[in-house]
Regions:
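Basic, flexible linker segments flanking DNA-binding modules
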Residues: 1-10, 16, 84-90, 160-169
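Mobile-element integrase/transposase regions
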Residues: 1-37, 45, 49-63, 67, ...
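Short, glycine/charged-enriched secondary-structure capping and boundary segments
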Residues: 23-25, 82-86, 116
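Generic short beta-strand
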Residues: 28, 41, 224-225
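A structural microfeature
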Residues: 39-40, 234
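Acidic/histidine-rich, metal-coordinating catalytic segments
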Residues: 47, 59-83, 104-106, 111, ...
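Charged alpha-helix within mobile-element recombinases
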Residues: 89-173, 215, 219-220
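C-terminal, beta-rich DNA-binding module of retroviral/retroelements integrases
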Residues: 144, 148-258
Length: 258
């Protein structure tokens, strides 16, 4: 449970609707879990990694960096075929020191407060379809302003989200991330094809980690642990050139809740 603003941000795409122009409209929503403050209600032209990363860069520059981001297991927030379910987007979050909190597959109630936000949007915005994307974005901006500034919440003691929310104390740097690992680690960069090279050995880890600096630490039986910032990705056996990934975050969440 979040105890302060920016402890947890929640993110999702609301279900799409068609504008009068025939354009598909699929809002990206980002919310501070503690204060209920809606950080973003944006209408990107596509739900791609690049579009969502651009929006998060804007949010981080404006509000700072949260401690945790909670999402479902869908693209571009996660990848079911990659180590730990990491996508390029969530690997970037990890490199920034943000912890990941994933809902269980097919359990939207795990992010229930965010789903209720989407119901409000469905009832109060989507029911009044605008002419085009620009007009619909303007309507979303007005709704977000009203929700944050003028809508009191019982859980906030009758206060509005804007009266509770404050920016993060963790600043965001626009400079490329330079991960530094501690004593006992060797740093290696994942190649564009997702492989890691070590003493003439090439081992595939994950394409989602392309360009990321990972830390290698000796483990038992001649194996090496592979870390991305604080996250243990798995182990590599360079004798067999094989990588064994850690259990996915979603599977681990399901196991713990069983």
């Amino acid at each position: 449970m979040p105890r302060a603003p920016n402890d947890v941000w929640t993110v999702d795409f609301k279900g799409w609707w068609l504008l009068r122009s025939g354009q598909r409209c699929e809002p990206l929503t980002v919310r501070d879990a503690f204060s209920r403050y809606v950080l973003a209600l944006r209408l990107p032209e596509a739900s791609t990694t690049a579009a969502v990363k651009t929006e998060f860069e804007r949010l981080f520059e404006l509000y700072g960096v949260p401690n945790v981001i909670k999402s479902d297991n869908g693209s571009p927030f996660a990848s079911s075929h990659a180590v730990l379910g990491l996508s390029r987007l969530s690997a970037w979050w990890v490199s920034l020191g943000i912890e990941l909190d994933r809902s269980r597959p097919a359990h939207p109630q795990d992010n229930g407060a965010h789903e209720r936000l989407h119901l409000d949007i469905e009832r109060e915005i989507a029911a009044h379809v605008a002419t085009d994307r620009a007009a619909q974005q303007a309507a979303c901006d007005l709704w977000r302003e009203e929700f944050n500034q003028h809508r009191p919440h019982e859980a906030l003691g009758g206060r509005c989200p804007a009266q509770v929310y404050q920016k993060s104390s963790r600043p965001y740097s626009t400079e490329p991330v330079q991960l530094v690992y501690g004593a006992g680690f060797f740093t290696r960069r994942i190649a564009a094809n997702g492989t890691l090279s070590w003493r003439r050995h090439n081992v595939f880890v994950s394409g989602a980690l392309a360009g990321c600096d990972v830390g290698l630490r000796r483990a038992e039986l001649g194996r090496f642990e592979v870390w991305l910032n604080y996250l243990l990705l798995g182990t590599i056996d360079f004798q067999t050139c094989s990588f064994l990934g850690s259990p996915s975050l979603a599977k681990e969440a399901a196991r713990l809740s069983a």
